[in-house]
Design a protein with these regions (language model features):
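Residue-level signal for the nucleotide or nucleotide-sugar donor/cofactor binding architecture
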Residues: 42, 181-182
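Active-site loop of classical SDR/Rossmann-like NAD(P)-dependent oxidoreductases
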Residues: 164-166
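C-terminal effector-binding regulatory domain of bacterial HTH transcription factors
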Residues: 2-5, 188-212
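Conserved amphipathic alpha-helical segments that form helical-bundle/coiled-coil interaction surfaces
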Residues: 80, 97-158, 168-178, 186-196
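A short secondary-structure junction motif
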Residues: 19, 23, 149, 153-156, ...
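Short linear motifs at protein or domain termini
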Residues: 1-93, 207-212
Length: 212
């Protein structure tokens, strides 16, 4: 069955995006419309529209899978520090009890994964921790910008092992406690410091790999 126009667009977009995020389509890879159309089973028009949408999201540049640089990483962190520190402040005021419990659970799961030596799986819990806080800012435009920044950062993380930063889980716990105690300024300050440390740690990894 040939998908209709809207379904074909959605199928093409989700197919390409998923393969970018799972590392199948690596940074710098050229996306060829004709080949993708045959792979997905749609015409070239929805492929073209999917690529255009992914370009708008910053995931594709000049029909190549975006390959973030160290400078791009700094720009992304500047966005995250500004917006997520504000989101943490809002979370300290508005986060519901059930969400606070879920926030604590991400920390418990992260500690268990660390004990089990599954450091790469900690990324998912880290992402969930930040997503819970971001969603509490109650600002759809801010959420959209942060989701885009985090997606680009995820593309970057596929190239390096950035999961073993010292004290990352402890910092999450400090942020969680500030939010639980409704200390908005402390929550905001701790989030900013946490992301600065994240940025510096990641830049050190890039430098060690000779890609800075």
């Amino acid at each position: 069955m040939v998908p209709d126009k809207m379904n074909a667009q959605k199928l093409a977009y989700e197919y390409i995006r998923e393969r970018m995020l799972d590392g199948t389509y690596k940074g710098g890879m050229k996306l060829v419309e004709e080949r993708l159309a045959g792979e997905i089973g749609v015409s070239r028009t929805p492929i073209r529209e999917a690529i255009k949408r992914l370009e708008q999201e910053g995931l594709i540049k000049n029909k190549h899978v975006y390959n973030p640089t160290a400078q791009d990483l700094i720009y992304i962190y500047e966005i995250r520090i500004a917006l997520e520190s504000f989101a943490a402040k809002r979370a300290a005021n508005y986060m519901r009890t059930e969400t606070i419990i879920e926030l604590e659970n991400t920390i418990k799961k992260s500690r268990n994964l660390l004990l089990e030596g599954q450091s790469k799986k900690i990324y998912n819990e880290t992402q969930h921790f930040h997503d819970l806080i971001i969603n509490e800012c109650q600002n759809p435009l801010m959420i959209e910008r942060l989701e885009e920044a985090q997606t680009i950062f995820y593309l970057f993380s596929l190239r390096f092992d950035i999961y073993n930063r010292p004290h990352l889980i402890d910092e999450h716990e400090e942020i969680y406690k500030a939010i639980k105690n409704k200390d908005e300024q402390l929550a905001s300050d701790l989030m900013a410091k946490h992301l600065y440390k994240d940025m510096n740690f990641t830049l050190e990894i890039i430098a060690r790999n000779g890609q800075y």
